[in-house]
Swiss-Prot record:
Binding residues for Zn(2+): 35, 186
Protein name: Somatotropin
Organism: Morone saxatilis (Striped bass)
GO cellular component term of the entry, any: extracellular space
Gene3D superfamilies, sorted: 1.20.1250.10
Organism placement in taxonomy: Eukaryota, Metazoa, Chordata, Craniata, Vertebrata
Length: 204
């Protein structure tokens, strides 16, 4: 029994003494931040949807399924298999573009001021963290030769004066797309982080 306890102690010491690299630390922070953003996006969408009438929900969901998100112009993996085959740098680059595409629209989300005030700084912090990870992983490659190409057009006529029905549709679309994109970024960063552990199973 004493020998077994001693062996377990040695093994535990060996595991706990494994150094955590700066890259792993940055990835952990980035994954945690986008996870929190994804949860916030889910909550905001659920709260908005629950405030609608049943028929309104049905019609908006039908319209959204036929529509597309502004960020769909950003080329990204089409399924989990392509995601797993993508390089760490590619996943980071797509994540950066997705986060940046929300910096402006997020300021006009039709949510309470407390929630809206949380979103912008969280996006900015996450964008900075991803940029640091890109710098650490690009090995001299230039991922963003023209920063102007990263700026996407605003979401249609969302910033114009809208009628009641159109405004409702735009709010639904923005919140649904925000939730969708935060889920994408969380998936990409989680897979990229997993690549740092060769023994880990990164299957989605």
């Amino acid at each position: 029994m004493d020998r077994a306890v001693l062996l377990l102690s040695v093994l535990s010491l060996g595991v706990s003494s494994q150094p955590i690299t700066e890259g792993q630390r940055l990835f952990s922070i980035a994954v945690e931040r986008v996870h929190n953003l994804h949860l916030l996006a889910q909550r905001l969408f659920t709260e908005f949807e629950s405030s609608l009438q049943t028929e309104e929900q049905r019609q908006l969901n039908k319209i959204f399924l036929q529509d597309f998100c502004n960020s769909d112009y950003i080329i990204s993996p089409i399924d989990k298999h392509e995601t797993q085959r993508s390089s760490v740098l590619k996943l980071l680059s797509i994540s950066y573009r997705l986060i940046e595409s929300w910096e402006f629209p997020s300021r006009s989300l039709s949510v309470g001021p407390a929630a809206r005030n949380q979103i912008s700084p969280k996006l900015s912090e996450l964008k900075t963290g991803i940029l640091l990870l890109i710098g650490a992983n690009q090995d001299g490659a230039e991922m963003f030769p023209d920063s102007s190409t990263l700026q996407l057009a605003p979401y249609g006529n969302y910033y114009q004066s809208l009628g009641a029905d159109e405004s409702l549709r735009r709010t639904y679309e923005l919140l649904a797309c925000f939730k969708k994109d935060m889920h994408k970024v969380e998936t990409y960063l989680t897979v990229a982080k997993c690549r740092l552990s060769p023994e880990a199973n990164c299957t989605l």
